[in-house]
Design a protein with these regions (language model features):
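Positively charged n-region of N-terminal signal peptides that target proteins for export
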Residues: 1-5
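Bacterial N-terminal signal peptides
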Residues: 7-15
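Mitochondrial intermembrane space
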Residues: 20-139
Length: 139
């Protein structure tokens, strides 16, 4: 009976030790895009890719979004544009455009899309995807 408090004390010490030395898991949202930083991709482009991933998950049309590495590295950053688009006149500091691929929800077909992202004060202000259809060759 006298050893019962000793046993509980040891169990409490062991659990507190494990709790205090538990490793913190890294933020998955940052870890997913860490490779882009190592590839020397500009920070606004990385923010746009992350915004597209979040946005596509919520849209009813697409369920998956992929930007190939060479398209991310070749993203066009337009600093001269002051509005996101004529249809959506959000004031922005820069517009980032890159070609990507999106998969239609419920289907297996990947579609080429032109992605545009507006950045204002270092934050993503607007995103848009438009299908990029190859012109048909008429002979």
């Amino acid at each position: 009976m006298k050893s019962l408090p000793l046993v509980f004390g040891l169990i409490l010490c062991a659990s507190l030790y494990q709790l205090s030395h538990a490793q913190e898991s890294p933020d998955p949202s940052q870890e997913d895009y860490a490779y882009l930083t190592r590839m020397h991709v500009p920070e606004p482009v990385i923010r746009c890719v992350a915004a597209f991933d979040r946005w596509v998950a919520l849209t009813p049309k697409y369920d998956t979004f992929i930007v190939p590495d060479r398209r991310v590295l070749g993203a066009k950053i337009d600093n001269d544009t002051t509005i996101f688009s004529p249809v959506n006149p959000i004031p922005v500091d820069e517009v980032i455009a890159m070609r990507a691929f999106a998969k239609v929800r419920g289907g297996s077909q990947w579609t080429r899309v032109d992605s545009r992202c507006g950045v204002r004060d270092g934050r993503v202000a607007g995103v848009s995807l438009s299908p990029n259809v190859r012109p048909k060759i008429v002979r």
